[in-house]
Amino acid sequence: MNGYVDFSPSPTSPTKEPGAPQPTQAVLQEDVDMSSGSSGNENCSTGRDSQGSDCDDNGKELRMLVESSNTHPSPDDAFRLMMTEAEHNPSTSGCSSEQSAKADAHKELIRTLKELKVHLPADKKAKGKASTLATLKYALRSVKQVKANEEYYQLLMSSESQPCSVDVPSYSMEQVEGITSEYIVKNADMFAVAVSLVSGKILYISNQVASIFHCKKDAFSDAKFVEFLAPHDVSVFHSYTTPYKLPPWSVCSGLDSFTQECMEEKSFFCRVSVGKHHENEIRYQPFRMTPYLVKVQEQQGAESQLCCLLLAERVHSGYEAPRIPPEKRIFTTTHTPNCLFQAVDERAVPLLGYLPQDLIETPVLVQLHPSDRPLMLAIHKKILQAGGQPFDYSPIRFRTRNGEYITLDTSWSSFINPWSRKISFIIGRHKVRVGPLNEDVFAAPPCPEEKTPHPSVQELTEQIHRLLMQPVPHSGSSGYGSLGSNGSHEHLMSQTSSSDSNGQEESHRRRSGIFKTSGKIQTKSHVSHESGGQKEASVAEMQSSPPAQVKAVTTIERDSSGASLPKASFPEELAYKNQPPCSYQQISCLDSVIRYLESCSEAATLKRKCEFPANIPSRKATVSPGLHSGEAARPSKVTSHTEVSAHLSSLTLPGKAESVVSLTSQCSYSSTIVHVGDKKPQPELETVEDMASGPESLDGAAGGLSQEKGPLQKLGLTKEVLAAHTQKEEQGFLQRFREVSRLSALQAHCQNYLQERSRAQASDRGLRNTSGLESSWKKTGKNRKLKSKRVKTRDSSESTGSGGPVSHRPPLMGLNATAWSPSDTSQSSCPSAPFPTAVPAYPLPVFQAPGIVSTPGTVVAPPAATHTGFTMPVVPMGTQPEFAVQPLPFAAPLAPVMAFMLPSYPFPPATPNLPQAFLPSQPHFPAHPTLASEITPASQAEFPSRTSTLRQPCACPVTPPAGTVALGRASPPLFQSRGSSPLQLNLLQLEEAPEGSTGAAGTLGTTGTAASGLDCTSGTSRDRQPKAPPTCNEPSDTQNSDAISTSSDLLNLLLGEDLCSATGSALSRSGASATSDSLGSSSLGFGTSQSGAGSSDTSHTSKYFGSIDSSENNHKAKMIPDTEESEQFIKYVLQDPIWLLMANTDDSIMMTYQLPSRDLQAVLKEDQEKLKLLQRSQPRFTEGQRRELREVHPWVHTGGLPTAIDVTGCVYCESEEKGNICLPYEEDSPSPGLCDTSEAKEEEGEQLTGPRIEAQT
């Protein structure tokens, strides 16, 4: 609006109006020029063409205005005006032509004032009538605004001309005409214009304007382009032609069609007019303008100016030729809860006749048919109930620009603010069902539009606003991108219901359908809405993949532990949560975003690495607080973020699927929302419980569970009950979040120390994380192939019955990581097909509770600390229905067994030297009834029973998955194995030391079996069994086992010197080979037991665990016949530097049971330095605080430790003899009072096997 169109008085028949003031033409014409710039809308003849007294009134107002004008402040202004009138208009009766000119000028003045009054906003009118004074003030203010805009442009150009002009090409006038002609010559309704960004003047305009506007091209010469725009479109023009927003022409020219379509997103709409088409009206025509940035050289040798090159195309009605096909007459609008348009799709322009800026911030109800306005209240009630989900409703009639009504079929949805749970805006996707009678929607309305809303409209708007101010119930939308918040197909159906055949318009709309308004947030929401269907499809496809399923199920399993979260968690997680607690909605929303981003970045990798989403047994009881500390003792950095997201959304879920959580929560939405009667067929919780039934996929399980949704609707859950339940869950979630955050301070300080302690095993950390899912792709190289199946099966064996922190399982040699999943159980536990020979089922050494001395034939009760709901199969020693095995002198509450079939090697049918109490009771195997006749005890060394101090067991067995041919619900049998050959058992008997017991204790505590001291004394040694490679996959622990897990063939080299490690494979002849200080297999670099069963987490690794997992080699029952092949496998799979070194080491050196010695003083010095670092994080109390602490805690006054943690030895220690060293296991929970025993503790039989190994830190 830099200037205005000058209107010369048109000759009309003279009309005398006596008594009317007759100001001079010069003075009045100047006033008209100053105030008539905002000349009219489509038709500006809507004012009264008054005569007589009306003219007198207008003349009086004008005279009063001139007299009081600030530009003529002197008191004799009126006199001066009258004198001027007298000089230029002498009163002569013969000058009729002069009188006629005066009359024409006065009439033109009055008409111009009326045109200005039409543009006066309604809020500036007094009692609905526009006064001349208010109109002229409004015009003057508009002129000042335009001048301010010009000054702004000049300042902008002076500051930005240098950076903007660097890459902007410069063209002459002829070149501009040449580069634009190829675009506009093909379209008669398009023209090109170059507008200076400095002065706003038109430097170039194409010849097509003459035919489009029916005027001469000279009308645009030396004029400002905004003079030809409709007044309310000037601001839109300025906002879209800001220099830094404009793409340079050189970038846009010569590009492919897709890029050009993308650049069309910069286009906007304006109305342009040139002069009058009729006597009393100015007709504007709508144009779509696409701006570009160029430099134009106006004259030869002159300096180039930054210009905006506009390609303007006239917009025709969508109902006139060329018509828009009926199936593509679709557009989208959004409006606020107070029923004001927030954004309008550009596709609405040819269908409604309105430009986007015409509707934005105007009432929606005003544009509707009066009979349809009450429907909007019902529609908004349903919008509130739908909670963001789209739905169709009754058609509504919408008024177009020409005053006609069109009928629209609309799909309504909403966006819910995740923080406030209130509706932010409503989205309407409209499809024109019936077009207008007058197809020219851009025609002027026959009557002026109502300026003030009808009272009923205002009342209805208030009702809708009050309605939408209520929080949306948690019925199905997480409020974050809630157009597809639940990933349900219902949204896709409802979207296509109103636009089934949108065709290519959809793709174009996604590129160029961004609203040309200042509301950027609405634009983003619109884009999200348009692509919602495709996003949901991709999300659904992602969910169908095994990785997504595993991740979702794992999340639920971790979260089902409930109270375990505050006790222990990841160091990274706690550090992440070291923030002020936010609201539930904020945490849930951030959780959704994190998991969505992780799913996008990890989906491809996880899909390639995970193969068994349904092989995760469920927990059927509340897990003890120590669960996560054991699981997450050594998290990898990659895993930590996943774990944070998992725990952020942790809500205690019921045992049944009364509250259904959508699987989509793991990628884009919160998993804490409770859905009742939801149509999504992915109830996670029941899916988790049913996963144990077999190797069927998660989708299959979820599909079966979807049929159980019917009864859910009959449970009597009302909105009130659901809201109360949801609020309770949210409060519990926030409470646990705060409790976990309290541990962040201590955990953050310990993290550096823990990382330093485990530097040497950084390469193995990915194998000991919690989920096992991430560990499968943590490693690279050849190990990646081996890790593909090493996903941790999350059975309840990770929980402890005593409630203490859980220790890590030592690595299992020759076992398959997936053996305990339902899909592989048939291979791991008992083979489905018989083999030539059955090796006896060696038991796991089970330990009884402290103070109980086992004797042969004695039945020891299982530990009482097991969790409720876990099945504890205890077979009495005297009753063995299926297996002809003999009871073990130790307590066998779980009594697992593993039969290992050898294809060719004949084993002795019986073992006369085997003690009566060697083998434990074996549980019943219903799936393999014939196995009892096949399995016979192998020759083993005698194990004279001896009394020993036993420890408190830690048992957490779980109920077996249906269809799993595994040991009742005992934990994997090989987790408790102490040896697999007579020689190994001999060594076990000879060299069983406190560390062996503690290692086994930690192991068994981790795996969920009873942990107790192993009673072993000296016995006669026997020769090794001949080599016979295993053919059956055996269970393994992915958390602890990796490519360096021992191979059964490798251990043939080591049986002569091998100790009885707690990680031995029961029947693979691999046993557990480790040095006397590694008996928790920390030598393997795995997580050791809670009792510290392992050497230091630095570099003291065993020289005997250097082979591949037999489950990887023998997954398809492959056999390795001899030691030479074993050695080849050693060299093939050993990838970590230590194992590569050991693989190339001579066998004689490998069998020396020697470990690199460390200087005791150096170790102590390092420890002292680390303690000094940790000392800084010790709390410092003021004197007042210390006084309060002494009053409450007496031990603070004495300077000692609390009784609960002031222990002289570890609870797992078998003996408290001199020299025992109890060290806390750093990687576990930092809870006080939990300590480990070093693996370096030796016992009586130590002198029989070799020198004592010092404990390493």
Swiss-Prot record:
Name used for this protein in its record: Period circadian protein homolog 2
Extent of motif Nuclear localization signal: 778-794
Region listing for Important for protein stability, in residue ranges: 478-482
Biological process annotations from GO: chromatin remodeling; circadian regulation of gene expression; circadian rhythm; fatty acid metabolic process; gluconeogenesis; glycogen biosynthetic process; lactate biosynthetic process; negative regulation of circadian rhythm
Motif LXXLL: positions: 306-310, 1051-1055
Motif Nuclear export signal 1, chain ranges: 109-118
Positions occupied by motif Nuclear export signal 3: 983-990
Residues annotated with Phosphoserine modification: S525, S528, S531, S538, S544, S659, S693, S697, S706, S758, S763, S939, S971, S1126
Tissues with expression: In the brain, high expression in SCN during the subjective day. Constitutive expression in the cornu ammonis and in the dentate gyrus of the hippocampus. Also expressed in the piriform cortex and the glomeruli of the olfactory bulb, and at a lower extent in the cerebral cortex. Not expressed in the pars tuberalis and the Purkinje neurons. Also expressed in adipose tissue (white and brown), heart, kidney, bladder, lumbar spinal cord, skeletal muscle, spleen, lung, pancreas and liver with highest levels in skeletal muscle and liver and lowest levels in spleen.
Organism in which the protein naturally occurs: Mus musculus (Mouse)
Region (CRY binding domain): 1157-1257
Skewed-composition ranges (Polar residues): 35-53, 493-504, 1033-1044, 1093-1111
GO cellular component terms, semicolon-separated: Cry-Per complex; cytoplasm; cytosol; nucleoplasm; nucleus; perinuclear region of cytoplasm
InterPro entries referenced in this protein's UniProt entry, alphabetically: PAS (IPR000014), PAS-like_dom_sf (IPR035965), PAS_fold_3 (IPR013655), Per1-3_PAS-A (IPR048814), Period_circadian-like_C (IPR022728), Period_circadian_regulator (IPR050760)
Modified residues (Phosphothreonine): T554, T858, T964
Residue segments, region Interaction with PPARG: 882-1067
Domain of life of the native organism: Eukaryota
Localization per record: Nucleus; Cytoplasm; Cytoplasm, Perinuclear region
Skewed-composition ranges (Basic residues): 779-792
Effect of W419E: Abolishes dimerization
Gene induction: Oscillates diurnally in several tissues, mainly in central nervous system and liver (at protein levels) but also in pancreas, bladder and lumbar spinal cord. Rhythmic levels are critical for the generation of circadian rhythms in central as well as peripheral clocks. Targeted degradation of PER and CRY proteins enables the reactivation of CLOCK-BMAL1, thus initiating a new circadian transcriptional cycle with an intrinsic period of 24 hours.
Phenotypic effect of disruption: Animals show severely disrupted circadian behavior. During myocardial ischemia, they have larger infarct sizes with deficient lactate production. Mice show reduced muscle strength under stress conditions, show endothelial dysfunctions and have a mean arterial pressure significantly lower compared to wild types. They have elevated circulatory insulin levels associated with enhanced glucose-stimulated insulin secretion and impaired insulin clearance. Animals also have increased levels of liver glycogen and impaired hepatic gluconeogenesis.
Pfam families: bHLH_PER, PAS_3, Per3-like_PAS-A, Period_C
